[in-house]
Amino acid sequence: MKKKYKINLHILEACNFKCRQCFSKFGTKKLLSVKDWEKIVDNCIAGADVAEFIIAGGEPMLYPGLAELVQYIRDKGVKVSLITNGSLMDEEWIKSYAGMYETIGFSVDSINDETNRKIGRCDRNGKAIPAGRIVELCGLIRKYAPECRIKINTVVSALNKDEVMSAFIDEITADRWKILRMKPFQYGSSSNLDIQVSDEEFEECVERNREKNKEKMEKQEEKEAEKEVRAGAKAGIETARREIVVEPDMKASYVLIDSNGCLLDNAVDEMTPVAVCDCLKEAFAEGLRRLTLDREKYEARYN
């Protein structure tokens, strides 16, 4: 029996931000056509039991054929999710496209504009996305695509390790909050090694936010229980259950295809992943056999 896979497609590396904490630093500048990505999708489906494709970048909303590619995947009967910084999203886009996605994930490393500028999570003019704008976008997704799940990805570095974001997460009622430790990289003059966090600093950041989240969830459950008693309801009132996923180490735990169409393996060196399969030329099934994948870590992320 084939094992189910969720496959990350980094359809381009270009981005309108320059985040130092971004882990999508593969040194790939290629822009494959929609037809090429369709071939890769078909290759993946032929070689594995694919449960979902997760579209990422760079900033995937910069890709000119995004909607066409997503529709192609959906027509194959496979779910699609999107990871975005949200800067190019507006109400019209949400009305037209949000319903196509299983999950829309926003990359939010800080709710402080100055911290975002230090991280590089801003445009060339230094304009960052206000936290309130992400709240608005999430509200619009809830309005126009209520079945779409909302996820927040937060990458922790020395620049934001002391921040508590649980109140923000609570405000947008995120279904999932992924807290990741920043992946170190150094390509020529570009490096983030000076803003790494220690094991202890990362764990402290996670626990600080997890504890605040727990307190809020307990208070919410108490309020909902009181409402249920007052209403005399026979059936329990559904309470939001926010899932927090912590990733201190991303090695050997992703099935990831870069913007060149290559399946990458980062088990040996996280800073320099190795291409184990050109998915436009080789069978994806063969690439999977060569890929180092820690099934326990991989399945813990998605289950």
Pin down the residues of each PLM region.
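Active-site beta-loop-alpha junctions enriched in small/polar residues
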Residues: 58-60, 85-87, 109-111, 155-157, ...
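Hydrophobic faces of well-ordered beta-strands that scaffold small-molecule active sites
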Residues: 5-9, 53, 80-82, 104-106, ...
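A structural motif
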Residues: 49-50, 101, 147, 174
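Structural recognition of alpha->loop->beta junctions
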Residues: 92-111, 168-179
